Amino acid sequence: MATSSEEVLLIVKKVRQKKQDGALYLMAERIAWAPEGKDRFTISHMYADIKCQKISPEGKAKIQLQLVLHAGDTTNFHFSNESTAVKERDAVKDLLQQLLPKFKRKANKELEEKNRMLQEDPVLFQLYKDLVVSQVISAEEFWANRLNVNATDSSSTSNHKQDVGISAAFLADVRPQTDGCNGLRYNLTSDIIESIFRTYPAVKMKYAENVPHNMTEKEFWTRFFQSHYFHRDRLNTGSKDLFAECAKIDEKGLKTMVSLGVKNPLLDLTALEDKPLDEGYGISSVPSASNSKSIKENSNAAIIKRFNHHSAMVLAAGLRKQEAQNEQTSEPSNMDGNSGDADCFQPAVKRAKLQESIEYEDLGKNNSVKTIALNLKKSDRYYHGPTPIQSLQYATSQDIINSFQSIRQEMEAYTPKLTQVLSSSAASSTITALSPGGALMQGGTQQAINQMVPNDIQSELKHLYVAVGELLRHFWSCFPVNTPFLEEKVVKMKSNLERFQVTKLCPFQEKIRRQYLSTNLVSHIEEMLQTAYNKLHTWQSRRLMKKT
């Protein structure tokens, strides 16, 4: 069943699969089906593996949903609850419409990353052909740690991924087109929906409240485009309008933004106006009565207000994550000039803002010394000094001087006796062994391997070494075998090594044998494989002894 860490988004009971009743589970990363009365899933598909979904036409006796996988397989689910079958099927369909595009982009991104790695690395591409195309190992096993290593390298170069901003004209991309039946069809993509949600949190809140409980996703966006919330003229909103409350929330938010003002003195344009110090000591700026009435009645003011609010929301959508990170720091610096500090108008803060604008870090003097932090995995080993294995006797300086004088006297009186160093028989046998044709000069007359072996054989041998090295790297990484996953992997890697030996190594041996090459070119590869087999045999023997 679902693990404790998995979030279950939707559960639909009375769903048949191959004439067997069960329940359908939609989780954060996969969809699964469990038979009735059992506590395990018999069908489970990751969203990234699903290509598309299909539903049965209206009027059919069976209310069905079909999942089409990238591999070409299909899975059918029959909603058998007569009273709510259509509603439950549509709820599953709408939820899948939201989830599948996210994982589809992720799958496409992984595929692009794999293609990029294969194009940039010819050795990796050849390794892929030798192991995956020849079916020595599966593609999942080949990419298991390749993508992880590449992700680790990329994360080390950049600690965080740059977020994609929001275009100020994203609503202009929603180009209405006539459908030929006195209707309009809007080009609404998942990116535009995400931009709407990030820019207008009130719409996202309405979406969560109504979809799919009160209406379908199609009905929601139809009412969104029909609403005055989407159009420029927002002076009059209907009482039954779903988005009337959103307009009020926007109006309130805009007033809050205006009341906060711009805290950065360098960006505050209103501070450039001359204000007489009359009543209120210059802090009360009340517009004239004649002018305020005309502004309310002017429809152009609503359009300008809408544009200002839209620009502010687009900027705020990109700065929400930055402000959340800045809350953890002591001195946040916001790009729009607004600061969360209440004491922003204090002289010290004002000086800090001015200093930040006129000083450059790269022009200042940096006297700090860069240090490298020591990462101790086992710090307790460094708490005590080294302990000697056995007791040592230290010599004094006088003992060292006396030893030096003694060695010096012996060297001055040394007389070489070369006839006693090596016997004549040993010297004669050594000369014979080092002569041409001797025991130690067997390879002296042989040609180099690059002159004896053709270039195509050399290239194929290099590919074999790279392939067997990759397989052995996976094999030896399983030791010490201390988890069930490693136990399963080491046995699987042994079968992969045997398959490689049969499909790649043996045909190569037969090929060089047909070309009458006397040099055993694959002896070292066979030795490496045999060492791996011996290691696995030793581990299995110890495992059996522990069980008995």
Swiss-Prot record:
Gene Ontology MF terms in the entry: chromatin binding; nuclear thyroid hormone receptor binding
Subcellular location: Nucleus
Post-translational modification: (Microbial infection) Upon Rift valley fever virus infection, interacts with NSs leading to ubiquitination by the NSs-FBXO3 E3 ligase and proteasome-dependent degradation.
Positions of the UniProt region annotated as Disordered: 321-340
Location of N6-acetyllysine modifications: K240
Polar residues bias locations: 325-337
Record PTM Phosphoserine, positions in chain: S339, S357
Cellular component per GO, a single term: transcription factor TFIIH holo complex
Domain named BSD: residues: 99-154, 180-232
GO biological process terms, semicolon-separated: DNA repair; hormone-mediated signaling pathway; nucleotide-excision repair; positive regulation of DNA-templated transcription; regulation of cyclin-dependent protein serine/threonine kinase activity; transcription by RNA polymerase I; transcription by RNA polymerase II; transcription initiation at RNA polymerase II promoter
Keywords: Acetylation, DNA damage, DNA repair, Host-virus interaction, Nucleus, Phosphoprotein, Repeat, Transcription, Transcription regulation, Ubl conjugation
Pfam families found in the cross-reference section: BSD (PF03909), PH_TFIIH (PF08567)
Matching InterPro entries: BSD_dom, BSD_dom_sf, PH-like_dom_sf, Tfb1/GTF2H1, TFIIH_BTF_p62_N
Family named by the database record: Belongs to the TFB1 family.
Subunit structure: Component of the 7-subunit TFIIH core complex composed of XPB/ERCC3, XPD/ERCC2, GTF2H1, GTF2H2, GTF2H3, GTF2H4 and GTF2H5, which is active in NER. The core complex associates with the 3-subunit CDK-activating kinase (CAK) module composed of CCNH/cyclin H, CDK7 and MNAT1 to form the 10-subunit holoenzyme (holo-TFIIH) active in transcription. Interacts with PUF60.
Function, in words: Component of the general transcription and DNA repair factor IIH (TFIIH) core complex, which is involved in general and transcription-coupled nucleotide excision repair (NER) of damaged DNA and, when complexed to CAK, in RNA transcription by RNA polymerase II. In NER, TFIIH acts by opening DNA around the lesion to allow the excision of the damaged oligonucleotide and its replacement by a new DNA fragment. In transcription, TFIIH has an essential role in transcription initiation.
Record's protein name: General transcription factor IIH subunit 1
Species in which this protein is naturally found: Homo sapiens (Human)
